[in-house]
Curated annotation (Swiss-Prot):
Protein name: Uncharacterized protein HHLF3
Species, as recorded: Human cytomegalovirus (strain AD169) (HHV-5)
Source domain of life: Viruses
Region (Disordered), start-end ranges: 67-87
Basic and acidic residues composition-biased segments: 70-85
Length: 137
């Protein structure tokens, strides 16, 4: 796993809906990263947790895009919290500041970031920045 800083691509909301934001580029070189989502039972941190591990993409950006579009069909941007527990809770990858760590936790349905282990969200909620630290769960 490359431990360099990874920057999410700038996106409009429409682009995010289409693509769900799963494509990342390293800033200096246009090298693609695959974002692998693993889901943890709710009730762990504030009831909602997703572990995201960033690995170098072997399959190529086209596969990542297809995979992310399938994800997006299953889980919409807004998931009401009173719904019964879904088998997958998807987080918007643009919702937090990416740090150069291979694994980190992002939480919190109310949008308050929580530091956990090596990862702490970089920007407070509501700042006008592409790296906003809220979770869409």
């Amino acid at each position: 796993v490359h431990r360099r800083r990874i920057a999410p691509r700038r996106c409009s909301e429409a682009k995010c809906r289409r693509r769900f934001g799963f494509m990342f580029q390293r800033s200096a070189k246009s090298r693609w990263f695959d974002v692998v989502l693993t889901f943890v039972p709710s009730g762990f941190v504030m009831g909602h947790v997703a572990i995201i591990s960033v690995t170098t993409d072997v399959l190529g950006p086209r596969h990542v895009k297809r995979k992310s579009e399938r994800q997006h069909q299953r889980v919409h941007h807004e998931l009401p919290h009173d719904k019964p527990r879904q088998s997958q809770r998807v987080m918007h990858p643009h919702a937090f500041g990416m740090r150069a760590v291979s694994q980190f936790l992002v939480t919190h349905p109310l949008g308050e970031p929580e530091a956990h282990g090596a990862f702490a969200p970089e920007t407070p909620v509501g700042t006008r920045s592409p790296l906003r630290s809220y979770a869409i769960l």
